[in-house]
């Protein structure tokens, strides 16, 4: 049985979250609880297309260990909620990347890692897509050629912050 709030004092610990003094009861919105769960259990799909993939693998290695942030790399798009586009995307590869993205369940997020994935990099040619945002809705850009593993970790932390600010995104958007 919950203690009545008449004899207990509500203490606001952050905006929209209160605790009942003297108990283990937290009062908050459903958005905050769902976003907390999502942001602390990201499952990225690694889609390495060039040299940035080496740095992405280094970010998952023991030195930085993204697992401590609840990030578990997945090999199947049906199990992932984040896709990390790491490297140069050609026009021939773009439909395949889009198909893999479409196979991911909602809500899904995109991280563009490296100068090539962000802007096309040094390859301003007829065969290179000038940024992953030309065919996917990119949420976080991680610049660099190639970016350090710490930069990818910073990008993932920025994505976690973005997820915590979402409202009402619980399932498939219509």
UniProtKB/Swiss-Prot annotation:
Organism domain of life: Bacteria
Protein's GO biological process: aerobic respiration; electron transport coupled proton transport
Membrane topology field: Peripheral membrane protein
Cofactor: [4Fe-4S] cluster
E.C. code: 7.1.1.-
Catalytic reaction(s) noted: a quinone + NADH + 5 H(+)(in) = a quinol + NAD(+) + 4 H(+)(out)
Binding-site list for [4Fe-4S] cluster: 51-52, 116, 145
Free-text cofactor note: Binds 1 [4Fe-4S] cluster.
Major location (coarse): membrane
Residue intervals passing through the bilayer: none
Keywords from the named record: 4Fe-4S, Cell inner membrane, Cell membrane, Iron, Iron-sulfur, Membrane, Metal-binding, NAD, Quinone, Translocase, Transport, Ubiquinone
Any GO MF annotation of the entry: NADH:ubiquinone reductase (non-electrogenic) activity
Location(s), subcellular: Cell inner membrane
Gene Ontology cellular component annotations, sorted alphabetically: plasma membrane; respiratory chain complex I
Cysteine disulfide partners in this protein: none
InterPro entries noted in UniProt: NADH_UbQ_OxRdtase-like_20kDa (IPR006137), NADH_UQ_OxRdtase_20Kd_su (IPR006138)
Homology family: Belongs to the complex I 20 kDa subunit family.
Function: NDH-1 shuttles electrons from NADH, via FMN and iron-sulfur (Fe-S) centers, to quinones in the respiratory chain. The immediate electron acceptor for the enzyme in this species is believed to be ubiquinone. Couples the redox reaction to proton translocation (for every two electrons transferred, four hydrogen ions are translocated across the cytoplasmic membrane), and thus conserves the redox energy in a proton gradient.
Subunit structure, interactors included: NDH-1 is composed of 14 different subunits. Subunits NuoB, C, D, E, F, and G constitute the peripheral sector of the complex.
Record-linked NCBIfam families: nuoB_fam, PRK06411.1
HAMAP family for the chain: NDH1_NuoB
Name of the protein: NADH-quinone oxidoreductase subunit B 2
Name of the gene encoding the protein in the UniProt record: nuoB2
């Amino acid at each position: 049985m919950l203690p009545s709030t008449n004899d207990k004092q509500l203490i606001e610990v952050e905006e929209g979250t209160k605790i009942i003094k003297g108990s283990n009861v937290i009062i908050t919105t459903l958005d905050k609880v769902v976003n907390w769960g999502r942001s602390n259990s990201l499952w990225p799909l690694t889609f390495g297309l060039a040299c940035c993939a080496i740095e992405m693998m280094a970010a998952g290695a023991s030195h930085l260990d993204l697992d401590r942030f609840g990030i578990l790399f997945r090999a199947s798009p049906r199990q992932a909620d984040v896709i990390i586009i790491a490297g140069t995307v050609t026009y021939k590869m773009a439909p395949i990347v889009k198909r893999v993205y479409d196979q991911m369940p909602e809500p899904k997020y995109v991280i563009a890692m490296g100068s090539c994935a962000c802007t096309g990099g040094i390859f301003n040619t007829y065969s290179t897509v000038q940024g992953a945002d030309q065919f996917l809705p990119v949420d976080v850009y991680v610049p660099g050629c190639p970016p350090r593993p710490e930069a990818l970790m910073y990008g993932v932390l920025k994505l976690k912050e973005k997820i915590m600010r979402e409202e009402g995104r619980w399932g498939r958007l219509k």
